[in-house]
Amino acid sequence: MATLSYAQSTDHWLKRKVVNLVELATGREKITSIYQQLKDEPFQVHQFFSRGIQLSRLSLRYNQEMEARIPRDGPLVFVANHPFGIIDGLILCEIAARIRGDFRILLNNRLMKDENLNKLFLPVDFDGTREATRKNVETKKTAQQILENGGTIIIFPS
């Protein structure tokens, strides 16, 4: 199973240590446990996110009138603002899957560690290299095309 971490083997050892400590302090073990349970089940993209919420023992309370106002077609962008870490992204993915069906997720390329989920991802590379810039331009073009075709994108700015 892929390690769920922003730390990369190419990072300076001190950065890896700090990132790992912060992740451990903010619940990486629990998230990893839930992720492992999800990976043990047959993969279905639309079930993955709702099942993740269920395994997290989250109880979602929201204004159903506001949810009803989310457009069912045409271009749409959801933005996760991260007050609760990965949880807000999980919830937005569940909402997008339920209401819109197909969607793509714009996120840090360091999170691209799951071959089943990678097909949903539009990676952003923060390495600052020419190759990163080239990849980011390609991601931007893909995102624009998705929106021009009336698709849905979730921005996961981590």
Residue positions per predicted region:
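Conserved Motif II region of HX4D acyltransferases
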Residues: 74-82, 142-158
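Membrane-anchoring hydrophobic helices of lipid-metabolizing enzymes
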Residues: 1-76, 89-91, 98-100, 118-119
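Residues in well-ordered beta-strands of folded domains
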Residues: 61-63, 79, 106, 123
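Loop/helix-junction capping segments adjacent to catalytic residues or to phosphate/diphosphate-binding pockets
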Residues: 86
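Adenosine ribonucleotide-centric catalytic and binding domains
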Residues: 80-83, 93-110
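Conserved nucleotide-cofactor-binding alpha/beta core module
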Residues: 104-136, 140-143, 147
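Short, flexible loop segments at the rims of nucleotide/cofactor-binding pockets, characterized by
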Residues: 53-58, 82, 129-134
